[in-house]
Amino acid sequence: MLLGGTSAEREVSFNSGKAVLEALLKQGYNAHPIDPKEYNVANLKKDGFNRAFNILHGRGGEDGTMQGLLEQIGLPYTGCGVMASALTMDKMRTKMLWKAFGLPVADMKVVTRETFAELDPQAVVAKLGLPLMVKPSLEGSSVGLTKVKAVEELKSAVEYALKFDNTILIEEWLAGDELTVSVLDNQVLPAIRIVPEGEFYDYEAKYISDNTQYFCPAGLTPEREQELAILVKRAYDAVGCRGWSRIDVMCDAKGNFRLVEVNTNPGMTSHSLFPKSAATVGISFEQLVVKILELSL
């Protein structure tokens, strides 16, 4: 049971790991918590483990590096493989791939540490409008996000995001509903609509606040739910996901769906969305954990 790790999302991973470990032990699995920060994962196989439930979040656990190590030692593991994990950690390249497949994403401008000096806020606002969303390409859990409401705020928002990553996305603001859709073994589960207390679903709303509201079913018409499920499955297949993943989707002001990002190791805490979605189709937390484990390759 891989949990903890070295990324900014270490604590979230511990919370997920605790819940999953409990569920596995309750069902008679011989499961042990392993924190890669404290233990050399290359020794897992020779220490007698025969599969890994990977609930690490963020860099070093969800970005293809851990997956590659587990492939090297020949240990089956849960979730996406090396390529899908590495690709989806990079929001910019994920969106470029989706765009190439003809799938809908927000309009964006990419800024790097090297190109920051040439950033022309006026030109960006002329192209994308206001407000804008500024975010690091690689950080998960909504770390480093800023909503920019005026052209003068853009540079400082990008500077702030550059503390977390070298590549920054400046995106058109999507004013419609925020949705997240879980996929389990190629089955698209019911969408969840997220209504944060603040202006957007940030770290506080995700992990701390009890005032964020979640609606599942999401209140979409059957036709819209079907349209969303088809879109999400195409997005999941395009990046090569397997086992389980959660895809975030926003609506623009006109209600058009826009793909946002993929979570290849979704959270599994009491606040988490994947278990909420599974529960609406009669899959208990314990059943979900076992199903994810059974899908490990």
Swiss-Prot record:
Residues that hold ATP according to the record: 125-180
Q: Name one GO biological process term.
A: cell wall organization
Gene Ontology cellular component annotations, sorted alphabetically: cytosol
Instruction: Give the SUPFAM superfamilies listed for this entry.
Output: Glutathione synthetase ATP-binding domain-like, PreATP-grasp domain
Q: Which UniProt keywords apply?
A: ATP-binding, Cell shape, Cell wall biogenesis/degradation, Cytoplasm, Ligase, Magnesium, Manganese, Metal-binding, Nucleotide-binding, Peptidoglycan synthesis
Please give the coiled-coil regions recorded for this protein: none
List the cofactors. Answer: Mg(2+); Mn(2+)
Compartment(s) of residence = Cytoplasm
Q: Which residues form the ATP-grasp domain?
A: 95-294
Q: Which reaction does it catalyse?
A: 2 D-alanine + ATP = D-alanyl-D-alanine + ADP + phosphate + H(+)
ATP-binding as UniProt keyword:
yes
Q: Which residues bind Mg(2+) 2?
A: 261, 263
Q: What metabolic or biological pathway is this protein involved in?
A: Cell wall biogenesis; peptidoglycan biosynthesis
Cite the binding residues for Mg(2+) 1.
Answer: 248, 261
User: What Pfam families does the record tag this protein with?
Assistant: Dala_Dala_lig_C, Dala_Dala_lig_N
State the free-text cofactor note.
Binds 2 magnesium or manganese ions per subunit.
Q: What is its EC number?
A: 6.3.2.4
Question: What is the disulfide pattern of this chain?
Answer: none
What is a single molecular function from GO for this protein? D-alanine-D-alanine ligase activity
Summary of the function given for this chain in its UniProt record: Cell wall formation.
Q: Which family does it belong to?
A: Belongs to the D-alanine--D-alanine ligase family.
Protein name as catalogued: D-alanine--D-alanine ligase
Task: Please tell me the species this chain comes from.
Answer: Haemophilus influenzae (strain PittEE)
